């Protein structure tokens, strides 16, 4: 699991924890746990055509492509290159609650924490 840019907050706001995963079992467990825990998550796509954005002119790989487009997707694609032999999840966490809400005080917050722990519990005990 990785967290990185926070770039997805522009698309989904502070209430949803955006994530990427290529593991169908984890996705199923996470979506179920998120609903049960009232800890919402939103799956974003690995859009493979954006691989070209992280191909640099000089180095082997570019973790911060110019232009500012698709920052959360390019970050997920970048990290995926390092875990090609393993199931993978990347959460693009914002981690800040701008206003108080039930079970979410204003300020720093562990986005998707309850959902992830419940999903892992389900995966590890089944």
Residue ranges: model-predicted function:
Residues 1-126:
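A generic structural signal for tightly packed, nonpolar segments enriched in small/aliphatic residues
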């Amino acid at each position: 699991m990785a967290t990185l840019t926070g770039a997805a907050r522009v698309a989904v706001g502070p209430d949803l924890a955006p994530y990427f995963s290529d593991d169908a079992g984890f996705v199923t467990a996470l979506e179920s746990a998120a609903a049960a825990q009232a800890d919402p998550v939103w799956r974003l796509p690995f859009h493979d055509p954006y691989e070209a954005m992280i191909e640099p002119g000089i180095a082997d790989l570019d973790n911060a492509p110019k232009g500012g487009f698709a920052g959360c997707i390019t970050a997920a694609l970048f990290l995926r290159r390092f875990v090609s032999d393993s199931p993978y999840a990347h959460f693009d966490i914002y981690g800040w609650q701008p206003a108080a809400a039930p079970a979410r005080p204003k300020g720093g917050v562990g986005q998707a924490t309850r959902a992830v722990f419940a999903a892992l519990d389900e995966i590890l005990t089944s």
